[in-house]
From Swiss-Prot:
A Pfam match: Cytochrom_B_C
Gene of this entry: petD-A
Name of the molecule in the record: Cytochrome b6-f complex subunit 4
InterPro entries for the chain: Cyt_b/b6_C, Cyt_b/b6_C_sf, Cyt_b6/f_cplx_suIV, Cytochrome_b_C_euk/bac
Entry coiled-coil feature ranges: none
């Protein structure tokens, strides 16, 4: 009968290894063969199974058939361009709209420098970066929903 030592945070050496960046594998267990040989194929095959099953279950036709002789009421871009479309549609000056769109990548590039003194990777311990991310996500969703509505209620979404 072998003795298996369970890791505990009361052990000084375990805390030292966790402090130096050891991951979830106990006592420096290598990634090969456990992670690379067993866990990765399970995740890859599970993802492939989900994609194939969803593709088989989905019907072939979505929406109305295309009619080249009938122009739609409003031509909308693809869904991933909705927030940008909403900015250009609602801002009175197109130059300001373009500057707002250029400000998004500039703002995203500055987020790491805001909290560069914070060494934690846990998002709950990086409140400024998490708040900027959540605010940007909510604004993008708000603008994306507003792009599908008429222009007079697009910014308020008809709520107020």
């Amino acid at each position: 009968m072998s003795v298996v030592k369970e890791p505990t945070l009361a052990d000084f050496y375990v805390r030292k290894k966790l402090y130096t960046g050891m991951g979830h594998n106990y006592y420096g267990e290598p990634a090969w063969p456990n992670d690379l040989l067993y866990m990765f194929p399970v995740v890859i095959l599970g993802t492939l199974f989900c994609l194939v099953s969803l593709a088989v279950l989905e019907t072939g036709s979505i929406g109305d058939a295309s009619d080249p002789f009938k122009t739609p009421e409003e031509i909308l871009p693809e869904w991933y361009f909705y927030p940008v479309f909403q900015i250009l549609r609602t801002v009175p000056s197109k130059l300001i709209g373009i500057l707002l769109m250029a400000g998004v990548p500039v703002g995203l590039a500055t987020v790491p420098f805001i909290e560069n003194i914070n060494q934690f990777q846990n998002p709950f311990r990086r409140p400024i970066a998490s708040a900027v991310f959540l605010f940007g996500t909510l604004v993008a969703i708000w603008l994306g929903i507003g792009a599908t509505l008429p222009i007079d209620i697009s910014l308020t979404l008809g709520l107020f």
